[in-house]
């Protein structure tokens, strides 16, 4: 019997090897996390088939490690799964032989290498005067007054997918709560970036949607780094939370982080948007691939003179420009800081999106089009094939 089981196992391997490998992302090795992969299943796979596949993948992983008579430190096999409408998959750490077999499995659509995710922000100085709020509420530059409707994002929940948020900061006035942590065991913002972006989209002083609720979703550590798989896990938590709490159609998400061109990330972002959450995404700085997922609102950055910043990414995927240079906002421990980057432009877009959802009652799938409709054509120094539209909240000023 042992002989026949071994023969059957070899036959399965031979069958798998007859199917072309579907491992993608190897053409660019920058920021790749060694031996870490994201497996995406065919869209037609059932829940039962998905469970069966996971058991098979785990068995293959254990067998291959056993044949090498070694544990290969860090190769833990299957770690986390994700499930969105029409999209199932998992992430894990596997040796090359195992991931090759997984990639050739008929139930697998493709396998993508996992990558390091980084922040885009550039710290400049503390406690400098802010200009972004005045700019987005006036059709012309020059005013420091923020003009807005008193609804101010009331009834909308914003997920800050970032380094965490100092939820006790006075800027949030009890409207901020902790959600989840997919990167470490420190349920606080040890970096400051997440608190800063949250202060822009929903802070009482520096924010746009001043009455929105805020939920901290930590996917990046104190150094501002994480992984594609960890970000996916965080987005999964947001969609599940929105579904359980009746927030779909009344929720927004800010993603001020840099992910190099990722097919699976784009699909996850699209799935989150289609589930009923408005997504604002940073275009990226200095060569980072812009978020090109359909339906998300991608933000590039301008300075106080309405000029596109030299470090902001560009291209046809940019939906709108937003203030991104020398932006003052909340910082951990009741502090403030001034940061620059498309990371700062994205929360302006997110805040205006939440503001419009509350004010006009529009759904998440209509928000980005409405933002582009309201925006003013005032950006200068923009690059080829990039919009001139600058974020505007429609105040009438």
Curated annotation (Swiss-Prot):
Residues of the active site: 162, 193, 343
Protein's GO biological process: proteolysis
Subcellular location, principal: secreted
Gene Ontology CC terms, in alphabetical order: extracellular region
The EC number(s) this enzyme carries: 3.4.21.-
Pfam families: Inhibitor_I9, Peptidase_S8
Domain of life: Eukaryota
Coiled coil: none
Residues of the signal peptide: 1-20
Chain ranges of the Peptidase S8 domain: 130-397
Carbohydrate attachment residues: 254, 385, 393
UniProt key word ATP-binding: no
Subcellular locations according to the entry: Secreted
Keyword entries, A-Z: Glycoprotein, Hydrolase, Protease, Secreted, Serine protease, Signal, Virulence, Zymogen
Domain Inhibitor I9: residue ranges: 36-119
Family statement: Belongs to the peptidase S8 family.
Purpose: Secreted subtilisin-like serine protease with keratinolytic activity that contributes to pathogenicity.
Name assigned to this protein: Subtilisin-like protease 9
């Amino acid at each position: 019997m042992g002989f026949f089981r071994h023969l059957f196992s070899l036959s399965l391997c031979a069958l798998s090897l007859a199917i072309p490998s579907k491992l993608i992302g190897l053409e660019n090795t920058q920021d790749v996390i060694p031996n870490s992969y994201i497996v995406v299943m065919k869209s037609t796979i059932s829940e039962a088939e998905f469970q069966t596949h996971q058991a098979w993948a785990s068995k293959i992983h254990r067998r291959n490690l056993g044949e090498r008579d070694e544990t290969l430190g860090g190769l833990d096999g299957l770690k986390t799964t994700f499930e969105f409408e029409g999209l199932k998959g998992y992430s894990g750490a596997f040796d090359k032989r195992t991931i090759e077999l997984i990639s050739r499995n008929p139930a697998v659509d493709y396998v993508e290498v996992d990558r390091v995710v980084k922040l885009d922000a550039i710290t400049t100085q503390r406690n400098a005067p802010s200009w972004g709020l005045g700019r987005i509420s006036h059709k012309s530059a020059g005013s420091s007054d923020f003009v807005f409707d008193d609804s101010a994002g009331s009834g909308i929940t914003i997920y800050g997918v970032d380094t965490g948020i100092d939820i006790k900061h006075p800027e949030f006035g009890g409207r901020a709560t902790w959600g989840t942590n997919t990167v470490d065991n420190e349920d606080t913002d040890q970096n400051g970036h997440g608190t800063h972006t949250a202060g822009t989209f929903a802070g009482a002083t520096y924010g746009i949607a001043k009455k929105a609720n805020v939920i901290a979703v930590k996917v990046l550590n104190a150094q501002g780094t994480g992984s594609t798989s960890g970000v996916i896990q965080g987005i999964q938590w947001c969609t599940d939370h929105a579904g359980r709490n009746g927030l779909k159609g009344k929720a927004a998400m800010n993603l001020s982080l840099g992910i190099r061109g990722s097919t699976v990330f784009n699909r996850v972002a699209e799935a989150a948007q289609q589930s009923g959450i408005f997504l604002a995404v940073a275009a990226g700085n200095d060569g980072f691939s812009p978020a090109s997922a359909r339906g998300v609102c991608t933000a590039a950055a301008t300075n106080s003179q309405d000029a596109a910043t030299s470090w902001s990414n560009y291209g046809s995927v940019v939906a709108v420009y937003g203030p991104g240079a020398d932006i003052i906002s909340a910082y951990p421990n009741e502090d403030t800081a001034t940061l620059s980057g498309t990371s700062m432009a994205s929360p302006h877009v997110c805040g205006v999106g939440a503001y419009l959802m509350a004010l006009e009652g529009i759904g998440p799938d209509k928000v980005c089009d409405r933002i582009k409709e309201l925006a003013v054509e005032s950006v200068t120094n923009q690059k080829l094939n990039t919009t001139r539209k600058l974020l505007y909240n429609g105040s009438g000023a």
